[in-house]
Amino acid sequence: MPELITNKYQPQFAQITQVDDLDVPTLWAMQAEARHDQQGLMAYVSHPETRGFLADHGFQSVSQTYFAQLNIRDFSGEPVVPVVDLEADLKAELVMLLRDHYERTHRFNPPIPNIDYAKWLFGDDNFDATHSIVRLTKQHIVAAILIFQTDNHLALKWTFGDDVATLQALWRDLLGILPIGSRLLATFDTTDVLAMSVYEHFHWHQTAPAQTLMMWPRAANNLRIQ
């Protein structure tokens, strides 16, 4: 049954779950509730029919997310710095870069201003500081790959860098670090140009249908399009 959930870091939009099961009365009720709570609505949609249904009711397509898996094979990479070995000042720089990256890629649904990014990263027990790596140039971070452990798998959460070439080079190095035979799961969003370059450059395997993020702004003139 479709429900509304709210991300505490991005409370401007409530997310619709089980969006493919939506009917018109339920959607109207959700739009009315969101308007009352001064929120917009958002949904991740895989099926074209559902995309059309939501578009007919005032939703706009914002981005597309791809779900992928990279199989790690034998590869000799270049030396890099694991996050676990960073000094305190470089960890602080990494947190600042993560904040800038997250805000830049969430302009349609901006996060609240007081997120503790250090706690979000280093305070998460699933953060894998050993397999997460950065590239340093003149003692500054120019590219990063941040990996988490989830259900006995490695999972990419964020990756960013100064430019495409630098980031892709770091990814080639990563292939020489991850255990041979392991699998790296990831999602890639079209709002993140640098990460999408990684998705397009390496041989990722699709693990689920791509999803389109659709949003209904609370400032919409009508609850529904007639």
Q: How would you label these PLM feature ranges?
A:
Residues K8-L27, K157-L167:
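A short, internal acetyl-CoA/4′-phosphopantetheine-binding micro-motif in the GNAT/acyltransferase core
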Residues M30-E33, W120-D124, D173-I177:
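A generic secondary-structure signal
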Residues V19-V81, R183-N221:
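Acyl-donor-binding surface of acyltransferase catalytic domains
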Residues L223-I225:
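C-terminal helical cap(s) of enzyme catalytic domains, especially alpha/beta-barrels
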